[in-house]
């Protein structure tokens, strides 16, 4: 859940629509949502890390509630390109027309951002955008609500002590977030859920 009483996915309101997947197939929708949330939260921590020239590894203009306001069709125009064309692609192999700021983002080879079949990612060679623009939909308002919730917390790359007064989210808590998300899919077998979603956490 995102905040008290807020659902990760709402099939009735069409917040998430997947290509050729009936709404009744809740597991496929849940697995997609878990991957999306896991990747987004991981990226939120990247914003806290700095490069050798003291620049954020991931700029605010690509991942924030303000970024959602500035980019209509946020999932396809920004997040897909951030996940699959930037974080999953070595710098020397990236296309030229990536969103501004992508040039400072490192390549991560851990597999978290490698697109799978159920990511429904089919990039157009000319535009770089997915060919599923009209059949895979994640509402901008959902990202607004999600990011506004994340912005209430202090994300830190250092694990906090029990004496910290400020409410912080550290790598240890990130691990718990992943575990809880996986339990949404399969409460009895976290390992099975990890394999199904391709979600692995490394602190």
Where do the protein language model's features map onto the residues?
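Preference for the N-terminal adenyl/adenosyl cofactor-binding alpha/beta module
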Residues: 1-203
């Amino acid at each position: 859940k995102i905040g008290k009483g807020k659902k990760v996915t709402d099939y009735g309101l069409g917040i998430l629509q997947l290509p050729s997947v009936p709404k009744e197939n809740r597991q496929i929708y849940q697995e997609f949502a878990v991957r999306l949330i896991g990747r987004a939260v991981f990226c939120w921590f990247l914003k806290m890390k700095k490069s050798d020239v003291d620049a954020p590894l991931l700029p605010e203009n690509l991942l924030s509630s303000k970024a959602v306001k500035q980019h209509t069709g946020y999932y396809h125009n920004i997040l897909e390109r951030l996940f699959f064309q930037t974080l999953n692609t070595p710098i020397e192999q990236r296309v030229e027309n990536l969103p501004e700021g992508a040039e400072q983002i490192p390549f991560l080879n851990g597999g978290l951002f490698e697109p799978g079949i159920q990511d429904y990612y089919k990039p157009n060679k000319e535009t770089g955008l997915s060919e599923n623009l009209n059949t895979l939909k994640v509402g901008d308002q959902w990202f607004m609500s999600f990011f506004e919730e994340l912005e209430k917390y202090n994300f830190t790359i250092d694990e906090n002590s029990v004496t910290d007064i400020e409410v912080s989210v550290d790598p240890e808590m990130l691990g718990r977030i992943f575990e809880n998300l996986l339990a949404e899919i399969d409460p009895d077998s976290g390992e099975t859920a990890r394999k199904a979603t391709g979600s692995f956490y490394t602190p």
